[in-house]
Amino acid sequence: MNKTYVFTDIHGQYDLWVQIKNYIDESDQLIFLGDAIDRGPDGIKIMREMLADPRITYLKGNHEDFLTRYTSPTNILLWTKANNGGRPTYEALLQLSEDERAELVTAIKELPLWAAYKNDKGQCFYLSHAGFTPEQDLYLDHYDLLWDRDHFDDQWPTEEEFKNTYIVHGHTPAIYVAHRRNELQLVDYDPGYASFGIYTYEHGHKICLDLGSADTKKIALYDLDEMKVEKYFYGQKEKDTQGSEEET
């Protein structure tokens, strides 16, 4: 049976991307919530492969938004600051030909900001990079869909029409969203690597998949048909760290 999966915020971790693309079947569909680039070394490589993969619906993230504005000197300085992590991406862009850069920037500018998916159980998912509130106008709130962190405390509507509606997002690591809401006990626990996983909140209606992959070398592949994590994938750095901890 064909499956539909979602993942987010891979931030240049090519080994994680290789694991995911090799794990899914040719007939599966994959929704990526943005931020392929920055922080890690291989964002441009990942981005170009994703754009060429027919299985993938690629949504724009705030770091893709940085890339589309990189030609401005002021934006280059902002983008490549250490806290934004754009330096490896900017340097990789300079290795492309002028035509290749122009083609890539055009493709990124045209990426959608959100997607919707309804599974066979009648559960309807709205997906974007940063997340949003159910009553938002998805066609107008460009900034919020890429950058917003104010929706975390919004209460889920009680109307019947929202009963089978869910919002899936990245942008902010799950552990930080849970900490802000004082709900660390609700963060999914990954016993395989004794570390945090995804965070589901607002009575199960909002799902944060960002695991801070650039630092943790870990990413979640979420199954929209079964509403659960299909698998956690781990990069080499975390495996090495885990191994050294076990030896001591």
What function would you assign to each model-found segment?
Residues 1-49, 53:
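N-terminal active-site segment of His-dependent metallophosphoesterases
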